[in-house]
A protein has these predicted regions:
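Intrinsically disordered, low-complexity acidic/polar segments
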Residues: 43-45, 65, 78-80, 100, ...
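Hydrophobic h-region of N-terminal signal peptides that target proteins for export
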Residues: 9-20
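Hydrophobic/aromatic-rich structural module bridging two neighboring secondary-structure elements via a short loop
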Residues: 69-122
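Hydrophobic/aromatic beta-strand elements that line small-molecule binding cavities or substrate pockets
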Residues: 52-58, 86-93, 120, 232-235
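Bacterial N-terminal signal peptides that target proteins for export
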Residues: 1-8
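Mature, soluble, non-transmembrane domains
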Residues: 103-269
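N-terminal cleavable signal peptides for secretion/export
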Residues: 19-82
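A short, structured loop/turn motif at beta-sheet edges
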Residues: 23-29, 57-66, 92-98, 205-207, ...
Length: 269
């Protein structure tokens, strides 16, 4: 199982809509944990149970934002065999959305499956650029015009939601291997006013925040495939916090329920 990195990985390109400045949203400096559990599985998937914990830390800094994600899952197959998976990723993205550093690690049963470290730079906002990898080997990946990085992508989706946009055609680079450059179809659904159905364990940071149900279908970049690689859904708050997470791999679905949410003091600039 490869865990999809950066749940905020969506970017608005050539949709005909006009969006507000993506830096206008104030992202909350926070740490959140989620309980992960199997929702459903098709018989052919061979999976009978999934449990685990997902951690997110988002810290706005003086010239950018640091985002850290880590997940530990235990998957049980028919017959009782259990497999543990661990995914961790850290990125730093500049406030002008043109540069990013990243490091990701994916392990299965304690063995390293893949690891990526590198930097990505764009010629300008929504312009093309390149990724320079230092791990696993020194290599370069071209980035197409219109691509944005995860933090800028989150802000762009929030701006689209504020504008009343519901369907978007997207491109995103998440900070990983070549397969994390994806085209994305995003649906922005139900809107919640500030204070409406606020999770009790997140009230301090969420009570005064509007939010939207969102769902993202990720496809291999430039692919004509009819089926996405995976789909992600969650409730997105205007300060960047997410709740009600659903990961859909086709053969099975895993939910993420918010357990804890706390403020992280941001540096004084």
């Amino acid at each position: 199982l490869k865990f999809p990195w950066a749940f905020f990985a969506v970017v608005v390109v050539a949709t005909g809509a006009t969006f507000t400045n993506p830096l206008s949203q104030t992202l909350a400096s926070h740490r959140a944990t989620y309980a992960m559990n199997l929702v459903s599985a098709l018989p052919q998937s061979g999976i009978v149970d999934v449990t685990g914990v997902f951690l997110v830390e988002q810290i706005p800094e003086c010239k950018g934002v640091t985002l850290h994600q880590a997940v530990q899952l235990t998957m049980r197959a028919e017959g009782g065999a259990a497999i543990s998976t661990r995914f961790a990723a850290t990125l730093w993205e500049s406030d002008d959305a043109t540069s990013m550093t990243f490091s990701t690690v994916n392990e299965v049963a304690g063995d390293l499956v893949e690891a990526f470290t590198g930097t990505a730079a764009l010629s300008g906002p929504r312009l093309g650029g390149a990724v320079e990898y230092t791990e696993p080997t020194a290599s370069t990946l071209a980035l197409p015009s219109g691509v944005l990085f995860p933090i800028a992508l989150s802000r762009a989706v929030l701006a689209a939601a504020e504008a009343g946009t519901r369907l978007l055609d997207l491109i995103g680079f998440d900070g990983g291997g070549e397969d994390t450059l994806t085209t994305v179809s995003v649906f922005i659904g139900a809107h919640f006013a500030a204070g409406e159905e606020t999770p009790a364990n997140g009230a301090d940071l969420l009570a005064d925040q509007r939010s939207w149900h969102t769902r993202y279908a990720h496809y291999a970049f430039a692919s004509q495939a009819a089926e996405p690689i995976f789909e992600v859904g969650y409730r997105l708050f205007e300060n960047g916090v997410i709740t009600d997470l659903i990961l859909d791999y086709g053969g099975f679905q895993v939910s993420g329920t918010l357990e804890t949410l706390e403020n992280i003091p941001a540096p004084i600039c």
